[in-house]
């Protein structure tokens, strides 16, 4: 059992499940909230086609390249793109999104899902500029769509 989130999804619990599967042990997933699914549900974005990418590169050039690639997939495939960041790097992630994505691209920031102080808002990149919330110590999921 993992301590937070959805065990084995963007979580080291996947390694334990893989070992259990190799040993032919019965694996029983328990119903519970998944911030990935909940963020798609609350974003207003495409819930029929979406991709979760986990953590994006930390190095600025690589991160910018990845953000542009994800944004291209939004427009080419009509696919919602989701990713996460370590809470202390949330502000930098938002800045990088605002710097590298088109003004009309939509960004949903979903933070503290199912917890006190839950924050889920969707705006265009243009509309987020100058309105970045304080999320430095809060688990967040970032979603891009058109």
Where are these regions (language model features)?
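Short glycine-rich anion-binding loops that position phosphate/pyrophosphate groups of nucleotides
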Residues: 3-7, 87-89
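Fold-independent oxyanion-binding glycine-rich loops
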Residues: 3-4, 33, 55, 111-113, ...
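Short glycine-/acidic-enriched loop or helix-start segments at secondary-structure transitions
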Residues: 9-11, 39, 93-94, 119
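General beta-strand structural signal in soluble alpha/beta enzymes
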Residues: 2, 29-32, 83, 109
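A contiguous loop/helix-start segment that scaffolds small-molecule binding in enzyme catalytic cores
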Residues: 76-146
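Short, small-residue-enriched loops and turns at beta-alpha junctions
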Residues: 6-8, 58-60, 117
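Generic anion/oxyanion-binding catalytic loop in active/binding sites
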Residues: 5, 28, 79
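Class I SAM-dependent methyltransferase SAM-binding "motif I" and its flanking Rossmann-like core
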Residues: 11-73
